[in-house]
Amino acid sequence: DIVISIDPDELTINFFDFLTDTSDLLLVYNPAVPNAIPKAFPQRRIAFDSEVYLAEWFIKHTEKKGNLGKISSVAHAAVKFSQFLACSPIILVGQDLSFCQQRLHCFHSFYYDEHMDKVSRLNPRTYWEHMKISKFGPNLTHGMDLFGKRVVSTIAMESYNYIFSKKFKGLQNVINSTEGGVPIEGVINISLKESLYIYCRELVKDKKNSFRTTQLNENKIFKPFQDSILRQIQLLKDISGKLNTLKLKFLDQRTPGRKGKELFVKGMEILYEYILENKETALLLQGYDFAGFTDWYRSNYQILRKKELSEDCSLLDEEFERDLKFFDVLVGSADYLMVNFEKALTH
């Protein structure tokens, strides 16, 4: 059995109980996932190169691990890895991508259990399921499942369906035997019973080979890699220190006056120039909070456009609001990266 983990968000840890014996499991993971996850699979794990910049940074300072290509979910990664192993056929059995009546997540999943924790006599399970589905509003879509039964999905879930269709369309060895949800266009869609009857007449355990991974020295940290991490931590500490100085000067008391706003905006401009002196650091910060950086780019573009249209207009308040929001983005990004780079030194 193989476990796939790709999401660097700390929330990913909640999907693992860390009590189950993992000696018979193989972890295939993005190196940017929380460290507790690969640590739970000693000697039984394979990392693959990811497209996020944090993973690229690790590749640059260690070694290439191999790439599964562009992936958008655990399921896509699993299919890609199965193709890498030359598995045939590859049978999908869990890609419902729709609601089961009003239930979104499968039983015993992290999200479903979290949902069930809210159940009470006054607010039963059906109440919470209705609240969940009602949040999607105009994003709800309708379709037919494999057996001609009407199902409800969302635009987001349909996008995952489209990715499967685009990547695996026309492949005769990728079979979708998920009996709920909208069938995946371009691949073979048949019932699970048919798949088992046609393709699974021989027990896998009778013909499988033991999957061996390279024995690793858990305590070995290559010195060049360690030095790279230490340099990056120092750069992040410098940025964090400059942010703290700006906070003490302009943000710890009441809203600054005009002069204070001018100095804060100027201080942030100097900080941007400092960050951009090291492209790696800038990309790492952006990779942690891409949405925050996008908001800054959008706000900055709007301000520059207004200045082009009217050279005499004062946009100090807008510049201050732009930089104030981005200040929090930089603080969060720098703190997160510092903590996790420091963790990397201890494992």
What are the functions of these language-model segments?
Residues 1-88, 306-347:
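Acidic/Gly/His-enriched mid-domain segments of enzyme catalytic cores or analogous surface patches
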Residues 4-7, 18-24, 108-128, 192-203:
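Acidic, Ser/Thr-rich peripheral helices and adjacent loops at domain boundaries
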Residues 159, 168-347:
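Long, compositionally biased charged/polar accessory segments in the mid-to-C-terminal portions
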Residues 28, 90-94, 101, 173-179:
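A structural signal for short, well-ordered beta-strand segments and their strand-loop junctions
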Residues 46-48, 52-65, 107-112, 117-150:
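Active-site gating loop/helix substructures
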Residues 1-3, 7, 82-108, 300:
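Glycine-rich phosphate/pyrophosphate-binding loops
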